[in-house]
Swiss-Prot record:
It is found in: Golgi apparatus; Cytoplasm. This is WPP domain-associated protein. The keyword Cytoplasm applies. Expressed in seedlings, leaves and fruits. Keywords: Coiled coil, Cytoplasm, Golgi apparatus. Residues 410-456, 574-700, 792-812 form a coiled coil. It comes from Solanum lycopersicum (Tomato). GO terms for cellular component: Golgi apparatus. It comes from the Eukaryota. InterPro entries: WAP (IPR037490). Interacts with MAF1. Its main location: Golgi.
Length: 834
């Protein structure tokens, strides 16, 4: 019976190893087929992805070449694989692009790179999830296997862990390559941005230089024109004074001629008519006085009308009239008044000659011999008083406008004031330009600081990602520890169940052969107890090693997290200092902007003074127009004279043309002043935009502060999570210690039982020796199986090398695993059933 039991045990052991061998062969074939299918699917998708990536790189190169030299529309159509049709239609690139278009395209490129970066990150996350799911499915399949596979589980896990480590390494390498590519693209974009800023600054400098040159040219032309205008005006004033002096001398000569005529007529009269002649002269002089008084009264009325008309019409009609209408209106009034005065003078002269005729009729004898002289003298007497009265009108009007001679001085003073105002305005503009340059430099510093902040934010995002990865690794380690605990508990349960079954079988055998082989039974039972003790000790050591490794890994992870936390603290302190510096700079900028606003107020005040001066100039121009009208009137009066009419007309026409040219030039200068005002308004708008940008920068800094506060809150939450993880690790260590205590207690009880049965199983020593020999044979077989497994491992390594060549394109493993997951799930279940 003992021999039959040994043979049965050997047969069972052989069938068990044959089962194991068959299952290993089947699993190897299945894994080979699955890996080949995965590799083929990955190769196809990798080829497609390589083609698409090559197309994208080619299009990106073409796009970068466009930024260097310009692209055509046909080359831009090849860029459609990266962007949608709407984006291509909106991006109508031209060879002559404006600065705003270039900045818009630069921003679109940055957004496009950010989108690609986010897509790559999402794809890497999906790939990591698929690999983790595959790893979990393999661990589950290994966990489902029977308890007899526990000894081979370590070897298979080592092989699988090596493959997964290689996969993780290749994934990290791919991620690093993609990150380096994106970093280089960011550097290229930053360089292009700096070049664009330099080009913009050069363009602005060119525009400023051109504007300065044009201003200098316009200023010189304006000054030359003003000097010429003043010279012409001075000449005109001198000529007018000379003409007035000539008119006054002419009047005196005419008066002398008239006196000579009257004296000659009186000489022809007889002595007894001397009294009548005296009477005539007295009457003539009285009439002349009355006529001059009437003329003066007429002039006074004219002056009153001239003074009254503007007062009456300034508020009603003159506001609604243009310059030409006003000139025609006043010319009509002046012509009417002149005609009225001429009619009055004509009446007086007629009365004079009627009286003289009556006198001559009374003295009838003296008229006959002098009829011819009388006719000539009558004609002269009619013309000479008219000319004298007109000359008196001209002199009276000259006396009415004594300020005409002093206008040169007033214009000179106004010119000096305008020069002073212009110099002050230029100084203020230079100060405004300097302040604008300072503001631009400060804005460039702010932009550099924002770029640095963005870089720090990217670094913070990377640190947060690393923290998330560490958290995932911690969770994976915890999951692996829990799975291992479950596996070992199952294994211990199987061991305890097998030991109980063996003990029961041994008890049955012992009862059967108790009477015959007491000594042999005690020896065999003792050997079995020793084997069980060895197995229990091995399991205890394995559990201790696993728990120690888990604790070491947890400690290492905690140390790394602590170091990363310290680095983040240092980075945040540096960012806080930079934020404080930026706030101080922004405060300084705000103060400078307040100063600029004050300077703008001063400029506005100076502009108001300039407008006042221009209004004064306008008034002087109105007076000059009045003078011009008076000159025209003088020309009309002097046109009746033959000698002075032609010269006066020519000179007045010349002066009139010069004044018209001066008016046109003044209008041109007004337009230039309006353009300068428009440029000042544009500069004020630019300053307002700069203020708006500064406010935007302040808002961004506030947002950064809120982000820092949120990061601090997240850091506190992470600390709490780490503390929870430490507590869980401590609890798991306590659970392991309790489990060890329980196992030791059970082992002690089992040892007591085995010692009790050891005294009854000495007779089974020989069979135990035979079993040892058979175990040696089976160990040799195991070594052969291990060599076979090593060969399989080498083949798997070769397959892993093949997979490493295609690891840059392992993004679609999840699909292949889903495709072949039924096969992987089918075989472990069949094995378990068998």
């Amino acid at each position: 019976e003992n021999e039959n039991l040994g043979d049965e045990i050997l047969e069972d052991f052989e069938t068990y190893w044959e089962d194991v061998n068959d299952r290993l062969m089947v699993s190897r074939m299945v894994s080979d087929s699955v890996i080949k299918g995965i590799v083929s699917a990955v190769e196809q998708e990798a080829a497609e992805r390589l083609v698409t990536k090559d197309m994208e790189l080619a299009n990106l190169k073409e796009y970068l070449q466009f930024h260097e030299g310009g692209l055509s529309k046909t080359e831009l159509e090849s860029f459609g694989s990266l962007m949608s049709q709407n984006e291509l239609e909106s991006m109508d690139f031209r060879k002559c692009m404006t600065l705003s278009d270039v900045f818009m395209e630069h921003g679109k490129m940055g957004e496009f790179l950010d989108g690609l970066r986010s897509l790559a990150k999402d794809e890497f996350k999906k790939l990591k999830k698929s690999i983790d799911e595959l790893r979990g499915s393999n661990s589950v399949s290994n966990k489902i296997s029977r308890s007899e596979m526990a000894k081979l589980e370590g070897i298979l896990q080592e092989k699988e862990s090596g493959i997964w480590v290689q996969l993780d390494k290749t994934l990290d390498n791919i991620r690093m390559m993609v990150d380096t590519v994106f970093k280089r693209m960011d550097v290229m974009l930053q360089l292009s941005k700096t070049s664009l800023h330099h080009w913009q600054e050069e363009h602005l400098i060119k525009v400023e230089l051109e504007s300065m040159v044009m201003q200098c040219v316009i200023r010189t032309v304006q000054e030359e024109f003003e000097y010429k205008l003043w010279d012409q005006y001075a000449q005109l004033c001198g000529d007018r004074n000379e003409k007035l002096n000539a008119i006054s001398s002419l009047r005196t000569e005419l008066d002398a001629v008239l006196k000579s005529l009257s004296s000659s007529e009186n000489g022809h009269v007889t002595s007894h008519g001397s009294h009548d002649a005296d009477f005539f002269t007295r009457k003539k002089s009285s009439e002349y006085v009355t006529s001059t008084k009437s003329v003066w009264d007429g002039n006074g009325k004219l002056e009153d009308s001239k003074t009254d008309i503007p007062e009456n019409f300034d508020a009603v009609t003159l506001k609604h009239m243009s310059k030409d209408e006003m000139v025609t209106y006043f010319n009509n009034i002046m012509t009417k008044m002149k005609r009225h005065h001429e009619s009055i003078l004509q009446k007086k002269t007629d009365e004079y000659f009627v009286l003289r005729a009556e006198y001559l009729n009374l003295r009838g004898g003296s008229v006959v011999p002098h009829k011819k002289d009388k006719g000539e003298s009558d004609i002269l007497r009619k013309k000479i008083p008219e000319i004298i009265f007109k000359l008196d009108d001209i002199l009276v009007e000259n006396e009415k406008h004594p300020a005409f001679t002093q206008e040169t001085l007033s214009f000179g003073n106004l010119k000096d004031r305008l020069d002073n105002l212009l110099s002050e305005n230029h100084q203020l503009r230079d100060l405004v330009k300097e302040k604008k340059n300072e503001v631009k430099s400060l804005l460039s510093q702010v932009s550099d600081a924002t770029e640095k902040r963005l870089q720090h934010s990217l670094a913070e995002a990377g640190m947060l990602k690393q923290i998330g990865e560490l958290n995932l690794a911690m969770e994976e380690s915890l999951i692996g520890g829990s799975v291992r605990e479950d596996v070992y508990t199952c294994f211990l349960r199987d061991l305890s169940g097998g030991a109980r079954n063996e003990v029961e079988e041994l008890n049955l055998g012992f009862n059967m052969i108790n009477e015959s082989n007491d000594t042999s039974a005690g020896s065999t039972r003792k050997i079995e107890i020793e084997d069980l003790e060895m197995e229990c000790l091995i399991m205890q050591e394995i559990c201790g090693v696993i728990s120690g490794e888990g604790i070491k890994e947890a400690k290492d992870m905690l140390k790394e997290l602590y170091l990363e936390h310290l680095n983040e603290k240092e980075i945040r302190t540096s960012l806080d200092t930079k934020l404080i510096e930026m706030e101080n700079k922004l405060k300084f900028e705000v103060e400078e902007k307040d100063r600029l606003m004050q300077m703008e107020k001063l400029v506005n005040e100076k502009e108001k003074l300039a407008t006042d001066a221009s209004a004064a100039l306008a008034k002087e121009r109105v007076q000059s127009e009045q003078v011009r009208q008076e000159l025209n009137a003088a020309k009309e009066f002097a046109s009746q004279q033959q000698t002075l009419a032609s010269g006066c007309n020519k000179e007045v026409n010349v002066i009139k043309g010069q004044l018209a040219e001066a008016v046109e030039r003044i209008e041109v200068l007004k337009e230039e002043v309006a353009q300068l005002n428009i440029s000042l308004e544009e500069k004020t708008e630019e300053l307002k935009e700069a203020n708006h940008r500064a406010n935007m920068v302040l808002a961004i800094s506030e947002e950064r502060q809120t982000l820092l506060s949120s990061l601090e809150s997240k850091e506190i939450a992470l600390r709490k999570q780490v503390e929870k993880i430490i507590g869980n690790i401590n609890e798991s260590s306590k659970m392991i210690a309790d489990f060890e205590c329980r196992v030791t207690g059970r082992l002690k009880t089992n040892n007591a039982r085995f010692e009790h049965s050891f005294s009854q199983m000495d007779c089974l020593v020989k069979k135990a020796n035979l079993l040892r020999r058979t175990t040696l044979l089976y160990q040799q077989r195991l070594e052969k199986r291990c060599s076979d497994l090593k060969l399989a491992e080498a083949e798997v390594d070769l397959l892993g090398d093949e997979v490493d060549t295609l690891l840059s394109l392992v993004e679609k493993i999840y699909i292949a695993l889903d495709h072949y997951s039924p096969v992987l799930q089918h075989y472990p279940g069949d094995y378990g059933d068998s």
